[in-house]
Swiss-Prot record:
Keyword Signal attributed: yes
Function: Chaperone specifically assisting the folding of beta-propeller/EGF modules within the family of low-density lipoprotein receptors (LDLRs). Acts as a modulator of the Wnt pathway through chaperoning the coreceptors of the canonical Wnt pathway, LRP5 and LRP6, to the plasma membrane. Essential for specification of embryonic polarity and mesoderm induction. Plays an essential role in neuromuscular junction (NMJ) formation by promoting cell-surface expression of LRP4. May regulate phagocytosis of apoptotic retinal pigment epithelium (RPE) cells.
GO cellular component: endoplasmic reticulum; plasma membrane
Superkingdom of source: Eukaryota
Annotated region (Escort domain), positions in chain: 156-195
Protein's name in the database: LRP chaperone MESD
PANTHER family, alphabetized: LRP CHAPERONE MESD (PTHR17600:SF2), MESODERM DEVELOPMENT CANDIDATE 2 (PTHR17600)
One BP term from GO: Wnt signaling pathway
Biased composition annotated in UniProt, kind: Basic and acidic residues: 187-224
Region described as Chaperone domain: 1-155
Motif (Prevents secretion from ER): 221-224
Gene of this entry: Mesd
GO function term, MF aspect, one: low-density lipoprotein particle receptor binding
């Protein structure tokens, strides 16, 4: 009896050890029959990351995190809904304002009076400061001796800024969405062109010549 009980204990121990050594069936089971089991991917050291790895990591973070609409790139932001009840068919600018809401927009500004690049920098800086005080977020870039770009993050305010610029004394012209708007200082070049024309007319006018001949005839009579 003692020997048989001892033998049973040894057999139970061997069976238990075999069960422990066997891997679980989940390790070999797959969702689809015949699919090969891929070993787990070895984790890469972050010190060995290249630009492609960093881009994938950033993309994964963007998927996992909830990013606000204002922080998204412009091409990924949802378009603002358009309230057609507020549109005026007689004013095309009102339609453009609604469609450009929340989108970046640029306008070109030309300075009158043949300024230097430094003068253009100073003049446009004053305009930018006035717009900033009126709560308009505008960025400014000088692209020539008499030309600058005003860039807005919200294009719906572009036409209000255009109205401000064209009323400035040194603003010759504003170009917005392919449309050219003459400024208050746009007539300076035309005035400069008309001045020599007036001078030429005076020189070619026959009346002054007739008056000179009359003066000569009068002087001859006095001599006689």
């Amino acid at each position: 009896m003692a020997a048989s009980s001892w033998l049973r204990a040894v057999l139970l121990f061997l069976c238990a050890s075999d069960l422990l050594l066997l891997s679980p069936p989940e390790a070999y089971a797959t969702d689809t029959p015949g699919e090969a089991i891929t070993p787990p991917r070895k984790k890469k050291d972050i010190r060995d990351y290249n630009d492609a790895d960093m881009a994938r990591l950033l993309e994964q973070w963007e998927k996992d995190d909830d990013i606000e609409e204002g922080d998204l790139p412009e091409h990924k932001r949802p378009s603002a809904p358009i309230d057609f009840s507020k549109l005026d068919p007689g004013k095309p600018e009102s339609i453009l304002k609604m469609t450009k809401k929340g989108k970046t927009l640029m306008m070109f500004v030309t300075i009158s009076g043949n300024p230097t690049e430094k003068e253009t920098e100073e003049i446009t800086s004053l305009w930018q400061g006035s717009l900033f005080n009126a709560n308009y977020d505008v960025q400014r870039f000088i692209v020539g001796s008499d030309r600058a770009i005003f860039m807005l993050r919200d294009g719906s305010y572009a036409w209000e800024i255009k109205d401000f610029l064209v009323n400035q004394d040194r603003c010759a012209e504003v170009t917005l969405e392919g449309q050219m708007y003459p400024g208050k200082g746009g007539g300076s070049k035309e005035k400069n062109k008309t001045k020599p024309e007036k001078g030429k007319k005076k020189e070619g006018d026959p009346k002054p010549r007739a008056s000179k001949e009359d003066n000569r005839a009068g002087s001859r009579r006095e001599d006689l």
